Amino acid sequence: MARGLKKHLKRLNAPKHWMLDKLGGAFAPKPSSGPHKSRECLPLVLIIRNRLKYALTYREVISILMQRHIQVDGKVRTDKTYPAGFMDVVSIPKTNENFRLLYDTKGRFRLHSIKDEEAKFKLCKVRSIQFGQKGIPYLNTYDGRTIRYPDPLIKPNDTIKLDLEENKIVEFIKFDVGNVVMVTGGRNRGRVGVIKNREKHKGSFETIHIQDSTGHEFATRLGNVYTIGKGTKPWVSLPKGKGIKLTIIEEARKRLSAQQA
């Protein structure tokens, strides 16, 4: 008889973008239930131990968390396997550091260091807009938030700029041709570009055609696209490379020039 969720995760079955060693042990941290899907998140233990190197062992991570040093989106989190995900702000007040979880062009999570001003907000993609009791409108975001009385102009797939201190919508970006987006799924995950065209297919997925700043065009599904700014200017700072995917030859040339320098 089943007794709830599985509490274990084998290391070989863990998502590739966690970048865990095969020989580092048999098991990996199983993400807790939370705002992000288990295959699209990064547990806090991996952020503190594997990425930031503030701990050497699992036990040290628990000690740091229990001292209430780690905040995600402005709230203290003590769960070692809390699932942090795309666009989340991880803050460490003790060291005056703030990081935003973004993707690199290889589809892996990148902890991008940000300033205090930028850590006060996050961009949330709108999943749906519904009406509750007595006709009260509310919207649902990609990270499980419910916000009542949104602007009537906000529609699904738009992006809202959310003030993390007051939990209020400051501004919003329409999902329109000409706006800058980041791809959050599929083989183009982590790439940044401007929407060029939107193909609608009845009874199937909508296809979005995107062009990056170097002029390369690619296409992906509507569900994989996340608006991050109006026009060509993103509202959040981007990691090194600015979401431009290099070919294998370009990468090799870049490595050679770095070695020679």
Curated annotation (Swiss-Prot):
Entry's transmembrane regions:
none
What are the record's GO terms for cellular component?
Answer: cytosolic small ribosomal subunit; mitochondrion; plant-type vacuole
Q: Name one GO molecular function term.
A: rRNA binding
Give the residue range of the signal peptide.
Answer: none
Q: A single GO BP annotation from the record?
A: translation
Domain S4 RNA-binding: start-end pairs: 42-104
| Lineage: superkingdom | Eukaryota
Entry keyword Ribonucleoprotein: yes
Locations listed in the record: Cytoplasm
InterPro entries assigned to the protein according to its UniProt record, in alphabetical order: KOW, Rib_uL2_dom2, Ribosomal_eS4, Ribosomal_eS4_C, Ribosomal_eS4_central_region, Ribosomal_eS4_central_sf, Ribosomal_eS4_KOW, Ribosomal_eS4_N
Q: Which of UniProt's keywords are assigned here?
A: Cytoplasm, Ribonucleoprotein, Ribosomal protein, RNA-binding, rRNA-binding
Q: Which NCBIfam families match?
A: PRK04313.1
Similarity comment: family membership = Belongs to the eukaryotic ribosomal protein eS4 family.
**HAMAP family with a match to the protein in the record:** Ribosomal_eS4 (MF_00485)
UniProt name for this protein: Small ribosomal subunit protein eS4z
Q: Record the organism.
A: Arabidopsis thaliana (Mouse-ear cress)
